A protein has these predicted regions:
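A flexible loop/linker signature enriched in serine peptidases of the S9 family
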Residues: 1-8, 13-40, 44-61, 67, ...
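Loop/turn segments within WD40 beta-propeller blades
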Residues: 110-112, 163-166
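Signature of short aromatic-glycine-proline-rich micro-motifs recurring in repeat-based ectodomains
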Residues: 153-162
Length: 187
């Protein structure tokens, strides 16, 4: 079996994927080691062809084909923090597309018309190649109508107290709610 992650297939059926040589925490930053992920291509056929697309000693991840299938985008720490890069299959060089600093770019995806989408520092961004990243304004509305639970520890105020026939439980009412408490397993 071939450990493949983040697979992207172009119209000709050529597959891009990131390899997985071993376990390393996916959230770890600036990891340079022999098990760092690389981008590979797989061309199916009578004689399948596997070709390593990236050579950086650190992490290269999450490849996505450009809509024309002639180049691809991926995340790399090649220039410091994770950013988006573009590369032509078989090329020795790549072009840096985003230039974020301090925090890593994560979760790269692409729409069919070529708009990139990714996460950066807890926000979602889109980018039309050749343009500038645009932060997506997101408003979260809640239809929650329940009141928040307020935890209260009380040592008085119980009413209507009753002990079970075997004496192992006690039931009581406090502030209109009925509670049953084990007298054997008190916590």
């Amino acid at each position: 079996s071939m450990p493949m992650e983040c697979i992207s297939i172009n119209k000709e059926g050529i597959m891009l994927y990131q390899d997985k040589k071993g376990y390393e925490d996916y959230w770890r930053k600036h990891q340079v080691s022999p098990i760092a992920r690389d981008i590979w291509s797989y061309t199916p056929g009578k004689t399948p062809v596997y070709q390593k697309q990236t050579t950086f000693g650190g992490e290269d991840r999450e490849p996505v084909w450009a809509p024309d299938g002639k180049s691809f985008y991926y995340l790399s720490e090649e220039k410091g923090s994770f950013n988006i890069f573009q590369r032509t299959p078989g090329a020795n060089t790549s072009k840096q597309i985003t230039f974020h600093t301090k925090h890593p770019v994560r979760f790269l995806s692409m729409a069919s018309e070529g708009k990139l989408c990714y996460g950066y520092n807890g926000e979602i961004y889109t980018l039309v190649p050749g343009g500038q990243p645009q932060k997506v304004n997101i408003t979260i509305l809640s239809d929650k109508i329940d009141k928040d639970i307020i935890r209260q520890i009380r040592s008085y105020g119980a009413t209507d107290i009753a002990v079970s026939p075997k004496g192992k439980e006690v039931a009581f009412i406090m502030r209109g709610d009925v509670y049953v408490l084990s007298l054997i397993h008190i916590s």
